[in-house]
Amino acid sequence: MNVTSFAALRAAAQDIVDEMIADPYGLTSPSVYETARMVVSAPWLEGHRQRVEFLLAQQHEDGTWGGPAAYGLLPTLSAVDALLSVAGTQDARRVAGAVESGLAALAGRFPRNVELPDTIAVELLVPWLIEQVDQRLSRMDDRGDLPGRLDLQADTGTLSGIRELLRQNTGIPEKTWHSLEALGAPAVRSGTVTPMGGAVGASPAATSAWLGDPPHTDAAKACLAYLHQTQARHGGPVSGITSISYFELAWVVTALSGSGLDVDIPAQVPDILRTALGANGLSAGPGLPADSDDTSAALHALDLLGKPESVDCLWEYDTGLYFTCFPKERTPSTSTNAHILVALADRRGQGDTRYDHAAERVGGWLVEQQQPDGRWMDKWHASPYYATACGAAAMARLDGPRTSAALDDAIRWVLDTQHADGSWGRWEGTGEETAYALQVLNHRAAPDRPALEAIRAGRAFLSGHVEDDRRNPPLWHDKDLYTPVRVIRAEILGTLAATQRLAEAEKEARA
């Protein structure tokens, strides 16, 4: 693609929209954690051999699976447990070698009291899988050089409490359905859990856990169809969350609508989002609980499309200081509050001072969450560049010295952390993180020479990798890290378009 051509950018963006409309699930990368769970719980499901092969192929040279540092713990536990479950049944030598190196990595690369990343249900899933692996090791007749148990802490107190609720046929929080696989036998066909469209919590692993082992009755047809469809999307491996259709619609619309790309957004996009909005807002996709992050993003997308809806559904998430994503959540989200501020700012000047006051209050809270070096961090993404792009966009919607200074600090941090090849990234330069960094720089109305040079170098990196999804590793938080593929493509294309004017200004300045 000639990425310097605005027409080519627009055509690529239109392709994303057209693909999105045709796909009811949303496109996310396959998950090591989730695929391993399916190896254990659904060996009867089509694609089992391919799922085992996927696990073997995804192991890193150091024996781990998944993301860097502590992000690798959960997927490594899940993969080791899964491969122990198939030991001796498929490609025995490779499986045994993968298990041995995986166990060595668990012993040598993760301290006993490792600080866990704030991924979904990590406080339930890690203790559960430590328990599972320990049980498998203890049952082995001939372990050889394998350890008898893992030297990792496994506090299963919270997990046991939720399991007991299921045993007593007491309802559990709907957000827990997404990780139902950790709850064991009480989860099988639990009457307190209701599949939607065949899916439990938009998760293949949770759906399989609810179904249980064959034989399955006719009542399970929708769930079986869901599992067959989700495994077919990647040829056996599965994504950790399916569907994310509302999330994908809202984020893609926002990324493209603010870029100057005149893409054709069909009327069914706002229709879908408006229909999904309820008294509590909407969720990332069907079968998930409503949350304020997806709700505020959808409200902003609808505003951009000229189809504004009331933001009153957001008030129930308001704590008086900041907004929660879900009721009774463990940690607040900076990116969510930034999205809410933007949605509230869309309504400023319309006669209801609640919007103005809430936007100012949330803006003050966001300023307090900013790190001393100028970045923000967030619980929905591994990279500070995502949170900082969200925070900067929120700061740009407010007036006043505090928010202006916060935006300046964010810009300064971005300029200070650019890599030599023009990219940005927490661990390595990625297209996604480079797009976020450029978005931050684009908030300065009249960038100085260093900022213009940084934008030029960043655009050059993006232009060279715009069609290379390999430069977009999983960074988003689910149970493990994942990539929302179309969202990232839209962010990159939209950023290239939105920064074209500044790139031309930098070129003129050098002439």
Curated annotation (Swiss-Prot):
Its Gene Ontology biological processes?
A: antibiotic biosynthetic process; diterpenoid biosynthetic process
**Which co-factors does it depend on?**
a divalent metal cation
Catalytic activity as recorded in UniProt: (2E,6E,10E)-geranylgeranyl diphosphate = ent-copalyl diphosphate
Enzyme superclass (EC): isomerase
Q: How does activity depend on pH?
A: Optimum pH is 5.5.
State the free-text cofactor note: Activity is highest with Mg(2+). Can also use Zn(2+), Co(2+), Mn(2+) and Ni(2+).
Q: Which UniProt keywords apply?
A: Antibiotic biosynthesis, Isomerase, Metal-binding
Which pathway features in its UniProt record?
Answer: Antibiotic biosynthesis
Q: Where is this motif: DXDD motif?
A: 291-294
Q: How does it assemble?
A: Homodimer.
The entry's function note states: Involved in viguiepinol biosynthesis. Catalyzes the conversion of geranylgeranyl diphosphate (GGDP) into copalyl diphosphate (ent-CDP).
Name of the featured protein:
Ent-copalyl diphosphate synthase
* Organism lineage: Bacteria, Bacillati, Actinomycetota, Actinomycetes, Kitasatosporales
